[in-house]
Regions:
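Short active-site neighborhood of thiol/selenol oxidoreductases, capturing the structured segment around
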Residues: 39-68
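Short loop/turn microsegments at loop-to-beta-strand junctions
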Residues: 24-25, 48, 157-159
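N-terminal "domain-start" segment that seeds a small globular fold
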Residues: 3-40
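Short beta-strand/turn micro-motifs composed of small residues
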Residues: 52, 84, 164
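Thiol/selenol-based redox catalytic cores and closely related redox-interacting motifs
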Residues: 107-179
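Short, positively charged
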Residues: 2, 7-9, 133-144, 192-196
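Structural microenvironment flanking redox-active thiols in thiol-disulfide oxidoreductases
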Residues: 63-115
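A short, polar/charged loop-to-alpha-helix boundary motif
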Residues: 178-193
Length: 196
């Protein structure tokens, strides 16, 4: 291995968080629509790469609802890539109801979660349940996002990455608790700075 290739591989070590200025590597995963999604197919387009928890997570389903219902505000070129810590069949069971106009992927083995340094935290789960109780109750009882079948890690924390047309991360947001996603307004501002 040459020093250059060793340096390039440092960002792919498990547990290493991505930072602003890092280039994204390719992601190839099964999509909910039955295709195999290739992240490099988005070259030349800005997007948000969003890592969710397990497919029946109430906070995740509330976030998916927000992204789908407000997707039109992000412009024609901008898209979202949603990755879940669940098997494809479980993902379909819980996420198809959203009718997402963007790719929804299953990373059942957590390959890309490790590559992106996505954290697992029992404290983050507890913090989210306590500090976001009104949101959790709304998700459970207002929207019906009840996690009857949990397939995936319960301790996975969410993460969002805003990526420019060159495949460079412009913003990396690692959730501090189970419901901590990048605010929609930040996504919208980024999309507006990268118009069609």
């Amino acid at each position: 291995m040459t020093p250059q290739s060793a340096t390039q591989n440092l960002s792919l070590r498990p547990g290493m968080k991505k930072r602003v200025g890092d280039k994204v590597g390719n992601i190839r995963l099964n999509a909910m629509d039955g295709s195999v999604f290739d992240l490099f197919s988005l070259r030349g387009r800005p997007y948000m790469l969003s890592f969710f928890r397990f497919a029946s997570c109430p906070f995740c389903n509330l976030r998916m609802h927000e992204l789908v219902s407000r997707f039109g505000e992000l412009g024609e070129r901008f898209t979202v890539v949603a990755v879940f810590d669940s098997p494809l069949d479980n993902l379909r069971e819980h996420a198809e109801r959203h009718h997402a106009p963007f790719p929804v992927l299953a990373d059942e083995r957590g390959i890309y979660y490790r590559q992106y340094g996505i954290e697992r935290s029992v404290a983050g789960v507890m913090k989210g349940m306590i500090l976001r109780m009104p949101t959790l109750l709304h998700a459970l009882f207002g929207k019906g996002y009840v996690p009857l079948k949990i397939k995936g890690s319960m301790t996975t924390m969410p993460a969002d990455f805003l990526v420019d047309e060159r495949g460079v991360i412009q913003l990396a947001h690692y959730g501090k608790d189970e419901g901590d996603h990048l605010p929609f307004e930040a996504i919208k501002q980024f999309a507006e700075r990268h118009p069609a």
